[in-house]
């Protein structure tokens, strides 16, 4: 009898397994509820679209303060999470997910997630870039040689290919039930977004046609000396405030900083002020160069992260 009962129990468990699998929650899929909007803001370009209706609304925004630099922000109640970091990836092209930081929006307090430096490139190309960066770190004082790429080999062209193939954005705010924004192909929207970034160059005093001919970008000589722990604003430290600041520097043909603009998604302007003040004073550069060695004005982007280390 004991053996018979044991076999019956195993069979019963096996029969219940499909029911448990079927109960696994499906992803929350949200369709667009607005068109893509490109916002030519004063110092940035934004690409914005809303998904879902009512309590399921999620707003997605891409933001760029310079060509080739892009952050991504998503906010809305469906993104509620207890995690401090949330991963996302573009489907069906994305492989390895990329992580973002969770924050709370003001004044509604809706969940918000910020992903910094979103590349929108294939994993193998990102790995290649990382390898080059790691090798450069071994020789931080050596300026990389000039690079000449065909139009189809440029990161811009490869990003456009990636964006065209991407049709969804998966956000793992709840690991057992991700939110999927059904974006459709991102190719046309990203192309319009990049045009805004190109148009912004003229507003900064940078010639877009000249910028496209640069084979050696601006080179920073001493970035490790720009900011230190001592530069953390004391009032912000006492308040426990943190921030991430994107610093955009205009560099003339002699390597001199002619303008500094600091931008942040955080509402703590003291971090912005400190970043520009210290970097403008301490930074040293070699200017951008054309193929014939002519030095030309260009720009340089630096991200400054203000974090309080845990005790």
How would you describe each model-predicted region?
Residues 1-9:
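Positively charged n-region of N-terminal signal peptides that target proteins for export
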Residues 9-24:
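Hydrophobic h-region of N-terminal signal peptides that target proteins for export
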Residues 24-89:
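An ectodomain-focused feature that recognizes extracytoplasmic/extracellular
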Residues 77-120:
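Predominantly extracellular/secreted and cell-surface proteins with exposed
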Residues 105-227:
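Internal interaction segment
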Residues 210-248, 273-311:
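Short proline/glycine- and basic residue-enriched helix-capping loop/turn segments at helix->loop/beta transitions
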Residues 234-235, 264-270:
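A short acidic/small-residue loop/turn micro-motif
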């Amino acid at each position: 009898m004991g053996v018979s009962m044991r076999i019956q129990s195993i069979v019963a468990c096996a029969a219940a397994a499909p029911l448990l699998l079927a109960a696994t929650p499906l992803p929350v899929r949200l369709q667009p509820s607005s068109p893509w909007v490109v916002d030519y803001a004063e110092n940035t370009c934004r690409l914005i679209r809303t998904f879902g209706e009512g309590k399921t609304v999620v707003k997605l925004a891409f933001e760029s303060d310079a060509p080739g630099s892009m952050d991504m922000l998503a906010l809305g109640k469906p993104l509620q999470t207890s995690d401090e970091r949330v991963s996302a990836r573009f489907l069906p092209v994305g492989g390895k997910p990329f992580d973002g930081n969770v924050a709370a929006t003001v004044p509604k307090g809706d969940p918000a997630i910020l992903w910094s430096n979103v590349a929108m490139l294939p994993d193998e190309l990102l790995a290649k870039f990382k390898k080059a960066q790691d090798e450069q770190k071994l020789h931080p004082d050596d300026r990389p040689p000039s690079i000449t790429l065909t139009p189809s080999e440029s990161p811009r062209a490869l990003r456009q290919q990636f964006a065209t193939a991407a049709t969804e954005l998966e956000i793992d705010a709840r690991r057992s039930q991700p939110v999927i924004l059904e974006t459709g192909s991102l190719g046309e929207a990203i192309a319009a977004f990049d045009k805004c970034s190109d148009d912004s160059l003229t507003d900064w005093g940078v010639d877009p046609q000249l910028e496209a001919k640069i084979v050696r970008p601006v080179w920073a000589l001493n970035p490790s000396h720009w900011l230190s722990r001592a530069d953390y604003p004391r009032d912000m430290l006492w308040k426990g405030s943190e921030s991430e600041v994107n610093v955009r520097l205009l560099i003339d043909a002699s390597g001199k900083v002619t303008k500094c603009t600091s931008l942040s998604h955080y509402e703590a302007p003291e971090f912005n002020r400190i970043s520009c003040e210290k970097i403008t004073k301490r930074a040293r550069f070699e200017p951008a160069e054309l193929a014939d060695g002519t030095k030309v004005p260009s720009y340089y982007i630096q991200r400054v992260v203000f974090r309080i280390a845990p005790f």
